[in-house]
């Protein structure tokens, strides 16, 4: 059973899609064909089976019901040094870091962070664009966020809360340590995507760029 050895865990609207595509071009990197599997954000039993809960409307419905199904995402890997996936909800969903470490011990995590206000507004515009957000006023959506969270609205509506990076990073540092957790900024990704990608390649123990492999 082939499993990933690294994860792009967030944050949403912070450049994770661009980084996914950059990494996917590297011959020593295999990325899951589904960019966002939404697997480790779900609770699992002792056998790696997703625990379904009817009240969890705030979570993305599971694409895979157990660890064996999830591993099929990586069965086409052919000796690449780095095997990964990118689900930006992972940094925010409670318990995800611990589940990754339990089922994929020693894996590395990559985080992209964006100015929280810019990130929140970008997430709001995205939710409006796809028809998920019923409001058109961002300020009103922020005012209603605490009530939405209490009513277990989907994580996509947690605009302000998903930008509270301290607690999110704290969990990952506690689980992964500094040696297995890399943090970059969205602004750096925009200004120098190749430079950020090269530093990520170094974290993943690959050569700096495709032409060097």
Please place each PLM-identified region on the residue numbering.
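Short, surface-exposed, charged loop/turn segments at secondary-structure junctions
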Residues: 126-127, 199-201
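Short N-terminal helix/helix-N-cap motif within the alpha/beta-hydrolase-1
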Residues: 92-95, 121, 194
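Conserved small/polar residues in nucleotide/adenosyl-binding loops
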Residues: 205-212
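Short, surface-exposed basic-aromatic patches at helix termini and helix-loop junctions that form
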Residues: 100-103, 201
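Residues immediately flanking
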Residues: 114-116, 186, 210
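PAPS-dependent sulfotransferase catalytic core
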Residues: 1-87, 102-112, 116-154, 176
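Phosphate-binding beta-loop-alpha motif at adenosine-nucleotide cofactor sites
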Residues: 83-89, 155-199
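Generic structural signal for well-ordered alpha-helices
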Residues: 67-71, 97, 169
